Structure formats: structure tokens, C-alpha cells
Amino acid sequence: MNRRQFAGNLGMAFGTLAIGAWTQKSWGITNTPSAHPVVEQLRQIEAKSGGRLGVAIFDSHSGQTYAYRGGERFPMCSTFKLLASAFVLKRVDQGKEQLTRRIRYQKADLVPYSPVTEHHTGAGGMTVAELCEAAITQSDNTAANLLLHSFGGPAQLTAYMRLSGDKMTRLDRIEPHLNEAAPGDPRDTTTPSAMVSSLREILLGGNLSGTSRQQLTDWLLANKTGDKRLRALLPSGWRVADKTGTGDQGTANDIGMLLSPDGAPLLVASYLTGAPGPAAARDAVHAQVGRLAASLITQQS
């Protein structure tokens, strides 16, 4: 079976994904053997960054998961917004929420970096769908806080992750406090392996209905904050559905789904913290991770 036939069998068309193929959990995966070429390349990328890099990659074609520092905790920063939007969609599937419901808020509710919500205070407000879109595509912090409030706060998001089988990911605070990224603080953290497994369940598995899964994928494909990270060095024809995160202490992240021209997805969780220097240097780390991930597909073609 060639890769194009494989993609067709997945039922993929512009990110439409068949369910059921990857429902088996792999929460125990932590690290690929240290002698593996992928690990060595990630180690070299980390060394040049001056920080601590954690990466997990799931190749849907081979079924292989690669991980470097896969079991170590890293600050999520805004990557949690993917999970929060997934939980909103889960509640829609359960009949507990409606994407058309309008949420009204005031100027006093605004927090730093709210490029979308700052224009809709007062009587107008925004729908739940609009808040999800703003949180994912623009990383709007107030939108994320309003979504958290809609389902009961950070603890409820953590509970959703536990019910989904993720025993590691936790959210404890709201924006902007969760971006503190203090070394050794377990609050608002995940591990690369746990996040990739959650992405498998949410984006490729049965956690969401087909309609909700497609909606989440569409929002992620429209993300406007990731051009310099995972997608920056990808070959022509690749598409990326991702969510970035940026915090204090030299922290920058990018997670999501890389779609080859044939449509076969790679799931990537790339977390970096403690990296000195300019933001552009941290962006470049994730760009190199994305290129490395894509090379796994290229080598198999």
C-alpha cells in the first residue's frame, strides 16, 4: 500500500480524519532508546538551544512514537488552549454546551494580550465558537479565560484530561499567571509523551464526534501564531494544525498535527524551557523539530 492509498483509507480530506485507528493508549511511552538517530538529532538541537527540550512525535503511518525527555514535565503555556477548546467541543457533543451561545463580558475581564476579545466588550460579547477560534488562532488570553469559566475552571479541564486517560497533564491557573513557568513548579504542566497521546485521542481517536473533531482541526489549521515554529522549515505541500505557547523563563512551545501532501498525519509535541537568547532562537528550535519530524515521513516514502 502506498502512502496515498493509506491516506485515502484514513478517510482524510482537508484534515477530515477517520476514527478508531489510534484509540489504543500509549501513556507509558517516555523515551526512545538513546542510540536512535532521532534522539541524537534532538539532543543536538537541545544543546544548541541552551535550554531543556522535550519532544514526542507520533507517526500514524508506521505507528511509531519517538520521544526525547518524553516523561519530563514542561510548562504548557498557551498550548492548553487546544485542550480547553477540545473540552468545550466534548461538552457540545454531550449536549452540555452550544457553540452559538453568546458570552458577554466587560472591560474589567480583559487580561494582557487579548487582540480579539478587546473589541467585543459590553452588550455584544462573543459566541462560544468565536471564543474558541480566538483562543486557538490568535492565542487570545481573555477568550481562553472565558472558556475556562464556561466549564468550571482549570480543575475541570484537568478532570477532563483524566477521564480521557491522561494522568500527567494538569492546569492550575488562568491567564496570564499560568505562563510563569518557574523551574520545578508542577502547576500548569504536561509531558511531551502525555500530550502526544492526548492529541491522538482528541485529533485522531474517538474522544470527540466527527463533526467536533473536524471543527477543532479547522481552527488549528487556521492558527496565525505558528508560522515561525513547527511549520517554518517544512517541505512544500505540508499543512500544520497547531497551537503555540510562550511563557517566562525562556519558554516556547508548539504542538499539533503535521499533514504531509499525501495526508498522513504526524502528531508533534515540542516543549522548550530555560532557553536564553532572543525569541527568534527559540522559534528556530521548533522549526528544526518540525523539519526532523517531516523527515521521518520522507524517509519512508
State each model region's role:
Residues 63, 75-103, 135, 268:
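Active-site SXXK
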Residues 2-15, 26-42, 149-150, 154-155, ...:
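Structured C-terminal helix/loop/strand segments within mature extracytoplasmic catalytic/sensor domains
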Residues 26-73:
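Beta-lactamase-like hydrolase cores
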Residues 94-120:
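Short, glycine/proline-biased beta-turn/loop segments that scaffold the active-site neighborhood
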Residues 54-58, 67, 83, 104, ...:
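Soluble periplasmic/extracytoplasmic beta-strand elements of cell-envelope proteins
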Residues 110-146, 154, 188:
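Conserved catalytic neighborhood of penicillin-recognizing serine enzymes
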Residues 132, 145-207:
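Mid-domain, small-residue-enriched loop/turn segments at the edges of structured enzyme/sensor domains
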Residues 46-49, 86-96, 107, 136-139, ...:
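Sec/Tat-exported extracytoplasmic proteins
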